[in-house]
Structures are given as C-alpha cells and as structure tokens.
Amino acid sequence: MPVLTRREALLAAAGFIAAGARGEEKVPAASGGGDTLLAALPGKNPLIQRAFRPPNFETPLADLVPLYTGNAVFFVRYHLPVIPQVVTASWQLRVGGPSAQRPLALSLHELKSSFPSASLAAVNQCSGNRRGLFSPRVPGVQWGNGAMGNALWSGVRLRDVLHKAGVAADALEVVFNGADTSVLPATPDFVKSLPIDRALDESTLIAFEMNGQPLPHWNGAPARLIVPGWTGTYWMKHLTDIRIQPTAFDGFWMKSAYRIPTGAFPTARFVSQETPETTPITEMLVNSLITSPAPAARLRRGEPAQLAGKAWDGGSGIAAVEVSVDGRQSWREATLGRDLGRFAWREFQLPLDTSSAGPLEIAVRARSRNGAIQPEALTFNAAGYHDNRVQTVRVEVT
C-alpha cells in the first residue's frame, strides 16, 4: 500500500515540480519569521510556507501549544526536490559497508519483527530554526520559531540493527541515505553520517511510528532516523541505506554544509569531521519558546492571564525556566509541567500581573540540568544556526 497515494503524489508534483525544474527555491516575501503565508500539503493542515521547492513548511505558533505536536501540523523539511513515493511492500533497508561483517537487507515487516521495540519522546528541531530572525539576514530557508516539534517516536534501536549486521572493530562512522533525490545530476545527494558512538547510543532509533500512528509521508515514511538531542539534519527521512565504514564520510552535506565555527558553541564534538576552522553542528542548545501570550497580544487589566511555553535542550533535561517582567532586573521561576524525558520539551507556566495598564515585556530563559542557560545575545554565524538567546514577547495591558 503506498505511503503516498497516486492522487497525493500528483497534487504534490503539481505544486512543486515546475519550480524545481528551473532550479529555483521560492521563499515567501514574509519570510523573516512572519506567519502570514499558509498552505496545505496533502495530509497536512495549513502550515507556514517557507519554500515551495523543495517543500519547507513550518508549524504555526498555535500548533506548538500541545505537549505533543500533532502529525498533521508537524513541520516539513526537505533538501532535495524529488519527493519519493515509497511503497511499503517493496521497501527495503540495506545495511552494509566495509565495516559491516554481515550485510543485510530488511523489509519493513522484518524491521518491526526482528528487533525489540523502543519508544521515546524527543524534540526534532531543524538546525536553522529561527534563521529568519537573524540580523543581518543570512542565506537559507528563513524559518521563524516553528521548524520544530515534540513527538513520541517508536521503532527499533539503531544499534540492534547495526549489531545484526556486525560492526567491525575499525568502524568510525555510520552513513545514512534516504529515498529523496534531486532534479539535476550535479546536485549532491542528501547523505549524512554519525560518529560510531552516537550511532550505537541506545537512544538513537529507526522509527516507523510518530505519536502512535504510522510515520506520515512528509515526515519520512516508512522509516526515518531519530537522533535525540541532535539537530534535525541527522534525522534522515525515507531511510533506505546504512553504511558502516572505517573512514570519515566526505559528502557535501558533511564536509561543506551544516557546519559552525570550531569552538563557538558548547556542544558534543564530531571529531572525525572536525577541521581547525569548522565542525559539524551536533546537539541542540538550551532554548525556550513563549507560546502564550502571543506577540502584541492585548491583555485586559485586572483579568487573569497566564504565561506559557516550552523549554528544551540537547539531552540533559530542563532544570528551571526563569521569567522577568522588569527589564531583566529580577527573575522568577516558572512552574514546570510534566517531564516526558530528557530529550522532550518541558512545558512551563506562570501567572502574569495585569493590575497595571501599559506595555509589558516578558523575558524567558531556560536552564539545563548541566548548568547551561540561555544567553542574552545571539552568537552570530553565517549559516544561521543556534539562535537560543533569551526569548521575549511584548504585550499591552489595557
């Protein structure tokens, strides 16, 4: 049974192929974090359209309020314009490479039935989330706040699959490829790698379910890689090939793209891919998002009002969320919500004082269990990554 029906495939093609054939990526004019242009992909609710071809759509702020982000509103991110129509009956996951002792091929049924099941809640965040808020502007998809979501991912542990294939002692990296392709032969295939220790970590999954349902087409069906705590660039969609190798993978999307200045951010290292100048982006930084009140909201004087939002990091977990309403002179701790695990986001809330009329600026910062805290200022980088500065929202009490 096709993951994407013929009608859906035709609709998707009609919406995107014409632009892709010209080698264009059209970005809406209101792209600097604005939420004005909404469009619906087949099977999705209306999302904020950031690019037409390849499809890049972000989740509206209102849909980031629930504890789990719904499948129909989860953001969509593609690097290549030819979106695969995967047929699960014929899909196979191939595992091999020079450091694989027993190469294998698995059908979806075999993947589901041959290994212990595993589930975890985790934030999937595009590396460039909030790029559209950078000043000066930097190239790339101009995401606002919604190139992320929190979901319950279910599947099998990658390490169990790798062990079945036999991991040789010289294994250095594991390389992943998916079924999406490019229009032009010269366009580099989207292929990523992980260091062997991260690939063998018990939290790294091959998922075929999202929030208790089969993985949606636009989010990687029938199976995708889940790398909790690391940015979404490693979460390979429509997974088809896994290669275990004794050398550093030198593909474009590792050696040239998704890189940050070496030493600029306190994140996990990817030693085999580092140079003196740059290193691959890896973990997410401690961060937060205010979901209520919305920017420029008008609150009624004397009536109850609640600050609410989400906080997350790269996997140590959230220790506290602090709120300031006096120009950051003093901070109060918000109440944290349910703990879904160290890779999931954590809800927070705090009653707001609406006794006085006038403008109100609310600042929020999260603190991780490892002691990291959101900084006051953005660490500028040319790729537009890691915007985790203190979050603010300005409202009016009337």
PLM features: residue spans?
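Short Gly/aromatic-enriched secondary-structure transition segments
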Residues: 106-116
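A mature extracytoplasmic/lumenal domain signature
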Residues: 97-99, 110, 128-130, 180
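Extended, aromatic/histidine-rich regions of cofactor-dependent oxidoreductases associated
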Residues: 3-93, 99-102, 115-116, 163-398
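Hydrophobic/aromatic pocket-lining and membrane-interface residues
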Residues: 95, 126, 158, 364
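Mid-length scaffold segments of soluble, non-membrane domains
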Residues: 148-154
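Short, conserved helix/loop micro-motifs enriched in His/Cys and acidic residues
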Residues: 117-147
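Stable alpha-helical elements in mature extracytoplasmic
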Residues: 91, 107, 122, 154-157, ...
